[in-house]
């Protein structure tokens, strides 16, 4: 049987309540006090009920906080042995998932997930007698506790005009209210909860955000200076839309915010992932910042932040972690801190981003069965050195850093693909690097 856990917990199409029940039993064998939250998906209550039944039947206690954003669950996990979020994040509505957090608000790492997975696969459960069945509680203050903590730690002096796109998801319960409490004039869209995501799909990309982007462009024709903040299905991510109605380039925004955090805090360590652009290295070069690259995934970023005492770490996708507040990826807090950055520099978002150079990014995914990925990557590492004339970094897959750009070849953690991503300063170089990367992977597959 393959792994249940991928790069972001358990996530699958038509997640079965049978799996959720077994996860609950496995969790209860190791942890007794559990807090559970869910996003707006139509299967959320079903999965929560099955998961809770497993925990109770294993002798654990459950506190439900109902529909909440993932950062609210992660923040409240500090009061329990473990937190469990039922969400498939940015995936379409037919998907659901289960993500576990420790009491520091840090998502489970591979070792912790493996322990739960082993119990499930061996069916090494303990089902208690009737007199030892656990109890279930409800905490109605979970969102308020989180909001009060954020309000104490974020300060925005400027009165910003903000369009917030909540994706018909759990951000509806928090994001518009926090921004308003901090003095913003807020227009919220897709702000009623609907697990079918009828306003737009939960992936906050350019296609799904077109209406919101056009709305901001129209509002600003009259000089209103709105910017946009959009969330995914569980609000652990954030993307920004500038005053011209353009989706902010993910890598540029990450670089700009990283620079702001260095200048504000004096902490010169920034953690990001192997797939992040070389923009961040070049934009922060004059500040003598150490850029620490990790495997893709918020767990790897958070663990490296702890290890290096970094204040900020993030992925280009908009999954950002603010260690001075908590260790759960937080799209709501990230949106507020983008406004803090604009306040700090007294500039518009487009002015900051347009100062940063643009590079060419290309990517491709090549079908590869999960049981072949390890052999393919061994071939890539062994033969890529002679092809690219450089020794690859192998933090996550193989990254070849070159004079004219870089090539990253890595196995997907959630799908049967090998992903190839390249970056260069012009189209010609980027296309050549992509062709080389694809050719190398196909050679590896042919050699099996």
Swiss-Prot record:
Assigned EC number: 5.4.2.10
PANTHER family: PHOSPHOMANNOMUTASE
Biological process (GO), any one: carbohydrate metabolic process
Modification(s) after translation: Activated by phosphorylation.
Top-level EC class as recorded in UniProt: isomerase
Family annotation (CDD domains): PGM_like1 (cd03087)
Higher taxonomy: Archaea, Methanobacteriati, Methanobacteriota, Methanomada group, Methanococci
Catalytic activity from the UniProt record: alpha-D-glucosamine 1-phosphate = D-glucosamine 6-phosphate
InterPro entries recorded: A-D-PHexomutase_a/b/a-I, A-D-PHexomutase_a/b/a-I/II/III, A-D-PHexomutase_a/b/a-II, A-D-PHexomutase_a/b/a-III, A-D-PHexomutase_C, A-D-PHexomutase_C_sf, A-D-PHexomutase_CS, Alpha-D-phosphohexomutase_SF
Family recorded in the similarity comment: Belongs to the phosphohexose mutase family.
Annotated positions binding Mg(2+): 89, 232, 234, 236
Gene: glmM
PROSITE patterns in UniProt: PGM_PMM
Subunit structure: Forms large aggregates.
UniProt name for this protein: Phosphoglucosamine mutase
Keywords, sorted A to Z: Isomerase, Magnesium, Metal-binding, Phosphoprotein
Record note on cofactor: Binds 1 Mg(2+) ion per subunit.
Protein's organism: Methanocaldococcus jannaschii (strain ATCC 43067 / DSM 2661 / JAL-1 / JCM 10045 / NBRC 100440) (Methanococcus jannaschii)
GO molecular function: magnesium ion binding; phosphoglucosamine mutase activity; phosphomannomutase activity
Phosphoserine PTM sites in chain numbering: 89
């Amino acid at each position: 049987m393959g792994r249940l856990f991928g790069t972001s917990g358990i996530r699958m199409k038509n997640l079965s309540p049978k799996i959720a029940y077994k996860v609950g039993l496995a969790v209860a064998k190791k942890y007794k006090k559990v807090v559970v939250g869910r996003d707006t998906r139509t299967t959320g209550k079903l999965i929560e009920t099955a998961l809770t039944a497993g925990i109770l039947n294993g002798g654990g206690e459950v506190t439900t906080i109902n529909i909440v954003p993932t950062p609210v669950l992660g923040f409240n996990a500090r009061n329990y042995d473990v937190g469990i979020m039922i969400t498939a994040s940015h995936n379409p509505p037919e998907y659901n998932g289960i993500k576990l957090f420790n009491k520091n608000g840090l998502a489970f790492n591979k070792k912790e997930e493996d322990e739960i997975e082993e119990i499930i696969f061996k069916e090494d459960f303990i089902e208690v007698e009737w007199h030892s069945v656990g109890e279930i509680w409800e905490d109605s203050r979970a969102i308020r506790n989180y909001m009060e903590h954020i309000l104490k730690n974020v300060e925005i002096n400027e009165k910003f005009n903000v369009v917030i796109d909540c994706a018909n998801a759990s951000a509806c319960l928090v994001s518009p209210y926090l921004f308003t409490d901090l003095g913003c004039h807020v227009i919220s869209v897709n702000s009623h909860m609907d697990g079918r995501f009828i306003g737009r799909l939960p992936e906050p990309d350019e296609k799904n955000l077109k209406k919101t982007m056009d709305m901001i462009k129209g509002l600003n024709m009259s000089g209103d200076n709105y910017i946009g903040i959009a969330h995914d299905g569980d609000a652990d991510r954030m993307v920004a839309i500038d005053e011209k109605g353009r989706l902010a380039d993910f890598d540029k925004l990450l670089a700009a915010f990283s620079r702001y955090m260095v200048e504000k805090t004096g902490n010169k360590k920034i953690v990001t992932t192997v797939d992040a652009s070389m923009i961040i290295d070049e934009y922060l070069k004059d500040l003598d910042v150490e850029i620490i690259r990790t495997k893709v995934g918020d767990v790897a970023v958070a663990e490296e932040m702890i290890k290096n005492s970094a204040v900020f770490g993030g992925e280009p996708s908009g999954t950002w972690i603010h260690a001075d507040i908590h260790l759960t990826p937080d799209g709501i807090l990230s949106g507020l801190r983008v406004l803090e950055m604009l306040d700090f520099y007294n500039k518009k978002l487009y002015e900051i981003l347009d100062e940063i150079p643009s590079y060419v990014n290309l990517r491709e995914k090549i079908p590869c069965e999960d049981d072949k990925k390890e052999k393919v990557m061994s071939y890539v590492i062994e033969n890529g050195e002679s092809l690219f004339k450089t020794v690859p970094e192998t933090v996550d897959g193989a990254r070849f850093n070159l004079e004219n750009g870089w090539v990253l070849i890595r196995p997907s953690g959630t799908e049967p693909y090998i992903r190839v991503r390249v970056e260069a300063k012009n189209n010609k170089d980027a296309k050549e690097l992509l062709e080389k990367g694809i050719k190398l992977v196909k050679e590896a597959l042919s050699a099996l």
